[in-house]
Regions:
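Blade-loop segments of beta-propeller domains
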Residues: 1-11, 15-27
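Beta-sheet-dominated scaffold domains
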Residues: 9-12, 61, 92-213
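Short loop/turn segments that connect beta-strands within beta-propeller blades
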Residues: 36-39, 76-78, 121-124, 166-167
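N-terminal beta-propeller domains
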Residues: 19, 30-32, 46-119, 207-213
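A short beta-strand motif characteristic of beta-propeller blades
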Residues: 40-47, 80-87, 129-136, 181
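Acidic/polar residues at beta-strand termini and the immediately following turn/coil
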Residues: 5, 22-25, 33-38, 194-198, ...
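Short, surface-exposed terminal/edge motifs of secreted or surface/virion proteins that either
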Residues: 19-36, 158, 163-168
């Protein structure tokens, strides 16, 4: 993620790497790192609490997320400070992406293991963001299976493909739904990832099939 730091007056790169490849629900937490985007020096820790899920920039704020639905929100343009902590769901949050807001500030979507949550900017005095559950009965196969295409979000659940365009809906698939879910190597589900081919209006999901790892 890129982020402008008004305290240091530089464009930063922010990074987080947790050992989730073998287990999407891993509770192991790792630090969040920062560095100047154009520098060659190694990244250094922001000094904020580690997380197991990941990070997302909802400019000018950094949100970090992980175990037990914990979300921590940085100060405006200051990734080295945490101003608010919220527990927004009961399970680990594994993915976050920015989305269109109401016009009063940034907004984002968070995917936990069993829900989809919207984060909406309120004000500094109210704790920055309000959180509401879009769906409390959802699922996600891989944190890298989520992709945005023209403002609509698509991802793979554990037994069906899903999308969000204001509400969560199942993506109809009468061609290869059973073939995919019967043959994906579930033990390596975190290797599933998505990419888009805008020229042809396509989204592709790549996955380990059969005994492939």
């Amino acid at each position: 993620e890129s982020f402008y730091d008004t305290v240091g007056g530089a464009l930063l790169v922010l990074a987080h790497a947790a050992p989730n490849l073998s287990s999407i629900d891993s509770t192991v937490e790792r630090p969040i790192y920062r560095g100047t985007l154009t520098a060659s020096a190694a990244l250094t820790s922001t000094g904020t609490p580690g997380q197991s899920g990941g990070i997302v920039v909802l400019a000018p704020y950094l949100l970090t997320f992980g175990n037990s639905g914990r979300v921590e929100i940085s100060g405006a343009n200051d990734p080295n400070t945490i101003t608010t902590t919220a527990y927004v769901t009961g399970t680990k949050i594994v993915r976050g992406l920015p989305t269109r807001g109401s016009g009063s500030g940034p907004s984002g979507l968070l995917w936990s293991l069993d829900s989809v949550i919207r984060a909406t900017f309120t004000s500094a005095s109210a704790g920055f963001f309000a959180f509401d559950t879009i769906s409390g009965d959802s699922s996600i196969l891989s944190s890298q299976s989520v992709i945005e295409y023209d403002g609509i979000y698509y991802w793979l659940g554990v037994d069906r493909p899903l999308m969000f365009n204001g509400v969560v809906r199942e993506i109809p698939n009468e061609q290869n739904l059973n073939d995919f879910y019967d043959n994906v190597n579930f033990a390596y589900r975190q290797k599933v990832y998505a990419y888009k081919v805008p020229r042809f209006g396509e989204i592709w999901w790549c996955y380990p099939r059969g005994n492939a790892t």
